[in-house]
Amino acid sequence: AEAAGAPISILVNNAGITRDNLMMRMKDEEWDDVLDVNMTASMMITRACLRAMMKARFGRIISISSIVGVTGNPGQANYAASKAGMIGFSKALAAEVASRGITVNVIAPGFIATPMTDVLDDGQKEGLLGRVPMGRLGEADEIAATTVFLASKEAGYITGGTLHVNGGMAML
């Protein structure tokens, strides 16, 4: 956008990988890979976009976290730490930039029908769905619609928040 002459006004941090393993078996590379992609890259991209947003006195920064960043999940200490870190990062950043017309929010999806969940066997899917009061996986379009809302003018008074889109998992 900036190369085309328009400043960046909306940033969605949605990169995310997993390298699941029990902590006692987790390799340093598995930890580092997940933190580098899920947290450090988001920080670097956010920092690169902030100057233009500050100058324009407007911006929307939306980070995609996960229910796992709030609840934890066995075998995903690295992923949970990275997604919880995104929530803390976003709250701190929201406090820094709110007076400049920039909102910073987080979406914490539950289990969404994606290639990551497609690899689960029927037993694993059944176990997941048992933790979702709505009894189904979410759809990518539901996360996209939430992102569009947080980027909109109508969400201009929402900052520092985490919006849970998880079929009710956060209430359990």
Regions found by a protein language model. Give the residues of each.
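Active-site helix of classical SDR
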Residues: 46, 82, 90
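A conserved structural motif in NAD(P)-dependent oxidoreductases
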Residues: 132-143, 154
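Alpha-helical segment proximal to the catalytic Tyr-Lys
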Residues: 51, 95-99, 156
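Substrate-binding pocket helix/loop in short-chain dehydrogenase/reductase
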Residues: 22-23, 30-35, 117, 128
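Short, small/polar-rich loop/turn modules that mediate ligand/substrate recognition or access, typified
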Residues: 98, 103, 158-160, 166
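Residue(s) in the substrate-gating loop at a strand-loop-helix junction
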Residues: 66
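Active-site loop immediately N-terminal to the catalytic Tyr-X3-Lys motif
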Residues: 21-24, 71-77, 99-100, 135, ...
